[in-house]
Amino acid sequence: MISDELRAANSAGAIATGLLALKIPVPLTTVQWADRHYYLPKESSYTPGRWETLPFQVAIMNSMGNDRIRTVNLIKSARVGYTKMLLGVEAYFIEHKSRNSLLFQPTDSAAEDFMKSHVEPTIRDVPVLLDLAPWFGRKHRDNTLTLKRFSSGVGFWCLGGAAAKNYREKSVDVVCYDELSSFEPDVEKEGSPTLLEIGRAHV
């Protein structure tokens, strides 16, 4: 027979599990989230370890993660940490805001390389992302070179921007471009990369 104490403990556990669905995280800005949770992997960083937002990066990252700002265009020099900022913002959207997002690289091969050398090590080294990736390190339909589908249901795509088909049939809230100046100005005669994704947030 089940004792009253065990029955009470089981009930309390079931109630606690059920209430998790109602838990709302304390809202954080992009920079607050990144300084608390984001880590740079050794494979693709000059200074691996815990991320610390530099003063000039604060406004950029907070603009990228702000729901009231629909488009962010950044003209930059080399070596300002843009790719790492972009990854931090993507991680923020995935874990903190539960947003489906799509990151474009200039070509399909560049997108696959980016997924392998930047995204996968970032998932591994950011504990709150790894918690959402039970498939990490093994073959799984939610773990491909074009899509990472997290246990929260959030999807992250990384695709090449040279093929018009990559702009279709993706239900995402956020679209980011890395190295936009390297994209074809007219994607297979269907329009510019940013016009093909019009109506969504752009970074």
List the predicted regions and their residue ranges.
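Phosphate/NTP-binding elements of NTP-utilizing enzymes
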Residues: M1-R200
